[in-house]
Amino acid sequence: MNRRAFSTLGAPGADLDEVVRLARTGRCQGVELRCAVGQLVYPDMPATEAGRLGAALRRAGLAVPVLASYVQVAADDSGVVERLARHIDLAARLGAAQVRVFGGGADRADGRREQAVRHLARAAPLAEAAGVGLALETHDTFLTGAEVAAVLEAVGSPHAGAVWDAVNPWRAGESPERTAALLGPWLRHVQLKDVASPTDLRPVPPGHGVLPLPSVLAQLGRLGYGGWISLEWERAWYPDAPPLADALPAFHRVLDAG
């Protein structure tokens, strides 16, 4: 059985006690920590504070499969590798296994993939030294498994992998079968969610929307994927959505049925 987590994107502003309570009452063994200003974890978090938080989560019996950064690896920016290094160090202090990154680079007319490859290739040795992975999400300018796999194949490092956001490749027209086949060699983490429609991305409880979640789970089974599956409940972006605690039972029902 896959280990289950939730993203703190679903509980914006939650403190440590609230995160631990949500995990315990919500039957989750791990927490995907969103790294953003004003949140429990933030990019300039002091090393000692990060270490204390990581230790507190471990005492609570919780793992941190992913530190969800907002670093855009295809950005035309000389500071990308430095930001990656800072997030790698933060992840190591928290005990996080992966640093989630985005592609970005929407302002680049061309060379976006090459820029992402360069930045990830330069940061991969830093991740290796820290015992942390880098994981490029199917998101923004790299929505599909095809786009993410092309980057990771060119990087060619075991310390650079993929996060499969289950909605994005599907809404871009890529089937779960195709996404799984493309990302299989690099898959490090899966974000599960459901939406009202391909053009209405408001969160709905898993199994109550239009995403073919049984197909996603079937493909993960065919891959033999034994890693984490996290509920990404986007309440930070949709504040009218029900609380995360209300969505977790549906998340478990979908996984139990799969």
What are these regions (language model features)?
Residues 26, 30-37, 62-69:
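Short, conserved active-site loops that position catalytic residues or coordinate cofactors/metal ions
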Residues 1-29, 54, 58-61, 95, ...:
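Histidine-acidic metal/acid-base catalytic patches
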Residues 10-12, 35-37, 70-73, 100-107, ...:
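Active-site-proximal loop/turn and secondary-structure-junction residues that shape catalytic pockets
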